Every structure is written in structure tokens, then in C-alpha cells.
Amino acid sequence: MANPDTIFSTPIDKIGDFTFDERVAEVFPDMIQRSIPGYSNIISAIGMLAERYAKPHSNVYDLGCSLGAATLSMRRSIDQEGCQIIGVDNSSAMVERCRLLINAYRSDTPVTILEADIRDVDIQDASVVVLNFTLQFLAPADRHALLEKIYAGLRPGGILILSEKYIFEDENANELLIDLHHDFKRANGYSELEISQKRSAIENVMLPDTIDVHKKRFNEIGFKSSEVWFQCFNFGSMFAIK
């Protein structure tokens, strides 16, 4: 059973910026399930997409892999000779726990977990690249360059899977979707204090884009096709095909 997320359950005098440290890594499975609507569906479908798009003797990347949920889903689904998965995260606490989880299961598809900044990783001969709720934590000025790098490293016909929290230009729609997300968190046992303090901690480090911004970026970089394939409230996932 996952350790319960109680990080923001008591009043904090000075709320610092949210970081993926040891405390977060310890409760991350509980936190993510109770915070992101549709997370399990996204993880399952990432495996389905990887099964469809992974090619023999190619690389599959999970950039910002955290505890390896997407990596494990893809490893269970990929059945291609010579295909390997490379997971990358810059949190030592996440990487340490991720390696333990990966090594707990045997598979014919090799997995390497790297502790590194995803902006510094070479993307080579890739058939599948996953950014699962990762891009939104990068400085907006760095996002286009990372996606260009991914595009350059993808094989023709390769797929990028990008899951993100979204903002919406229509103010009424945006507020409604935020409220529904908070209702989702309340239904999963988070208190008003927890919701408020988590929002204060994360608002300066997670800066979401609109769906239109994502699509425009994909188009400018050269992806031939992109679309939202899953959305629940203001969270969703897109694909972009080279």
C-alpha cells in the first residue's frame, strides 16, 4: 500500500517552492493518484501507444520518469527485438526509488535510469519519447528547444507523448475546470488546507500552457500530426508524430 501523502496537512509558516525531494518521493504514488484525474488511464494508454510505435533496435525515452510508472507500463507492452528504454530524472530521491522498482521485475526489454537534467540528455534513434507531466516544470523559455531536440532525435514516424496540466484562455472555463479539479482532490481526501498550501507551493514552479500553445509549438518544430488523446478537467495528454 502506498504511503499516504500528508506533506501539506499541517499549517506551514513559510511555504517554499515545491520540489521532488525525498519527502515527495516517499508519498509520490499516493500524491499523484489523488491529485491528477485520469492518471492511471494515461499510464495504461502510454503502454498501448508504446506497443504500437516502438520499433526494433530503437530507443524509448521517459523524460522526467519520477518513480517509473510510464517506464514500467511501456516495458510491459513493448515486444520488439533490440528496443531499450531510457528513463531520466533530475531528482536523486526519485531515481534511487525508481531503480529499485524497475529492478524488482524481470523483462526482456532493458531499462536504464539516469540521474540527469532532461535538457542535457542526447535523444538518439528514438521511436517513442514520453514527457509525462514534465514539460510544465521547465522554464517556458526552455520548452521549445527541448522539443526541437526530441524531434531531431526521433525516427520518422516516431511519437512524442506529452501529458500536461492545461490553462484555458476562456476565463470562465478555466475557473470551472480548476474548481472541478479541486473537487476531485476533496473527493480523494485532501483538506482545504492541503489544497491551498500545495497550490501556493507549486504555482511558481509549474507554469502550464494552453492546448493551442502546445499545438502551435509542435507545428513550428515540424511534427506532421498532433492531437489531444485524453483529457479530464484541466489535465490531459497529447501525441505528436514526426
UniProtKB/Swiss-Prot annotation:
Molecular function in Gene Ontology: carboxyl- or carbamoyltransferase activity; S-adenosyl-L-methionine binding
SUPFAM superfamilies: S-adenosyl-L-methionine-dependent methyltransferases
Keyword terms of this UniProt record: S-adenosyl-L-methionine, Transferase
Binding of S-adenosyl-L-methionine, residues: 39, 64-66, 89-90, 117-118, 132, 199
EC number: 2.1.3.-
UniProt-listed Pfam families: Methyltransf_25 (PF13649)
Subunit and interaction comment: Homodimer.
Family: Belongs to the class I-like SAM-binding methyltransferase superfamily. Cx-SAM synthase family.
Alphabetical list of NCBIfam families matching this protein: carboxy-S-adenosyl-L-methionine synthase CmoA (TIGR00740), PRK15451.1 (NF011995)
Functional summary from the UniProt entry: Catalyzes the conversion of S-adenosyl-L-methionine (SAM) to carboxy-S-adenosyl-L-methionine (Cx-SAM).
Name used for this protein in its record: Carboxy-S-adenosyl-L-methionine synthase
The species this protein was found in: Aliivibrio fischeri (strain ATCC 700601 / ES114)
Gene: cmoA
